[in-house]
């Protein structure tokens, strides 16, 4: 797959993150190209000098950040992302293209937004509840008349989406299709909306209360994979447990009850997931000193002194819009590297993904703990 991004007279070298992954997936899509095309036409038409403060939201691996920096290195940019890998990927791609990132502000999805924005560029996320929250956040800071350009696949844009935009930010219209994408132009109506509250629900069979922020998987119920995992947790005593890809933290919360001597580390690529886990730890009145929370690309930046004797993992097989197993493979490799001798990796996965093949190759052993028609619980021990 090509790594050369070329549109509107710009040429960039862009790779996904981590760059060493063997993949046929690009670091951008046609919607990125379409946004830049529309923006370039807008800049030429308005001849705006100097460029005005701009926010870039949901920029997968920095295509938009790199393009705007290449167009004008003095462009005041704020890049907002929930995914650690998106932020790390954007930084790598800026460096790869010898672009200066010093002037870029990097914000998480929950951080207060700048008050001086004149333009917003967005990619449409899969999660529309998260998208609605992002729009409502923008409604609190954007003056009336501010344009928000949103790129997406043409098939994802319909009347319901236009209605959602009008409800949460302002009137919107879609461009003509180009490379099977459209760019929506939404104009802020200047009316501030309140942010939605986290969704809270109970898991009575484990005496747990769960609170989910908008971009966390399984927003208002226990997902099937987590349920079978909770029913088949490892027996024994553990001192250090990692909930890898923690989501709302349900596995780590259950581990805290089962293994009272253990310290639990919650790790996720999503900042909202980590925040939800931390909120749920407090919600269930667990001792603060027994937990640590990490916004990270798997265990890439976890302190080397942390040597777990148990890693719990419900790996995703999506990265944004892309279906890929490289995240699971990275999780398994990180677990193998970080587990102490005799430590256990305990995972749940869809049967058709054949994770047992990868685990047997990596650890030299793999045991099927439980299974049903859709999911399988697998366990490997580090020698």
From Swiss-Prot:
**What Pfam families does this protein's entry cite?**
MTS
Which top EC class is named for this enzyme in its record?
Answer: transferase
Regions that span the bilayer: none
Reactions that this protein is recorded to catalyse: guanosine(1835) in 23S rRNA + S-adenosyl-L-methionine = N(2)-methylguanosine(1835) in 23S rRNA + S-adenosyl-L-homocysteine + H(+)
What is the protein's major site of localization? Answer: cytoplasm
Compartment(s) of residence: Cytoplasm
Q: Is S-adenosyl-L-methionine among the key words of this record?
A: yes
Which family does the similarity line name?
Belongs to the methyltransferase superfamily. RlmG family.
**Function (record text):** Specifically methylates the guanine in position 1835 (m2G1835) of 23S rRNA.
Kindly provide the name given to this protein in its UniProt entry: Ribosomal RNA large subunit methyltransferase G
Q: Which organism is it from?
A: Shewanella denitrificans (strain OS217 / ATCC BAA-1090 / DSM 15013)
State the gene name recorded for this protein.
Answer: rlmG
């Amino acid at each position: 797959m090509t790594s050369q991004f070329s549109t509107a007279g710009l040429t960039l070298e862009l790779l996904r993150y981590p760059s060493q992954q063997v993949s046929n997936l690009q670091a951008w899509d046609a919607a990125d190209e379409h946004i830049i095309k529309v923006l370039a036409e807008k800049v030429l038409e308005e001849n705006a000098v100097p460029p005005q403060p701009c926010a870039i939201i949901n920029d997968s691996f920095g295509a938009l950040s790199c393009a705007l920096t290449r167009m004008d290195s003095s462009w005041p940019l704020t890049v907002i992302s929930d995914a650690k890998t998106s932020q790390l990927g954007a930084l790598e791609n800026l460096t790869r293209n010898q672009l200066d990132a010093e002037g870029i502000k990097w914000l998480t999805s929950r951080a207060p937004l700048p008050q001086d924005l004149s333009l917003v560029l967005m990619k449409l996320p899969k999660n529309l509840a998260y998208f609605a929250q992002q729009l409502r956040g923008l409604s609190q800071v954007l003056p009336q008349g501010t344009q928000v350009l949103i790129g997406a696949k043409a098939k994802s844009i319909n009347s319901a989406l236009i209605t959602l935009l009008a409800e949460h930010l302002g009137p919107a219209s879609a461009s003509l299709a180009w490379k099977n994408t459209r760019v929506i132009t939404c104009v802020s109506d200047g009316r501030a909306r309140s942010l939605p509250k986290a969704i809270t629900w109970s898991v009575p069979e484990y005496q747990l209360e769960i609170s989910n922020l908008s971009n966390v998987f399984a927003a208002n119920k226990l997902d099937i994979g987590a349920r079978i995992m909770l029913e088949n947790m490892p027996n024994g005593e553990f001192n250090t447990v990692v909930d890898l890809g923690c989501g709302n933290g349900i596995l780590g919360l259950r581990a805290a009850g089962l293994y009272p001597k253990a310290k639990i580390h919650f790790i996720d690529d999503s900042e909202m997931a980590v925040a939800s886990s931390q909120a749920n730890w407090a919600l269930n009145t667990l001792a603060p000193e027994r937990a640590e929370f990490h916004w990270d690309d798997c265990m890439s930046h976890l302190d080397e002194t942390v040597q777990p004797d148990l890693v719990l993992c419900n790996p995703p097989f999506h990265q944004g819009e892309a279906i890929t197993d490289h995240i699971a493979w990275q999780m398994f490799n990180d677990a193998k590297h970080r587990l102490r001798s005799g430590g256990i990796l305990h995972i749940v996965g869809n049967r058709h993904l054949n994770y047992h093949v990868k685990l047997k190759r990596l650890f030299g052993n793999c045991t099927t703990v439980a299974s049903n028609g859709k999911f399988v619980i697998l366990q490997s021990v580090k020698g």
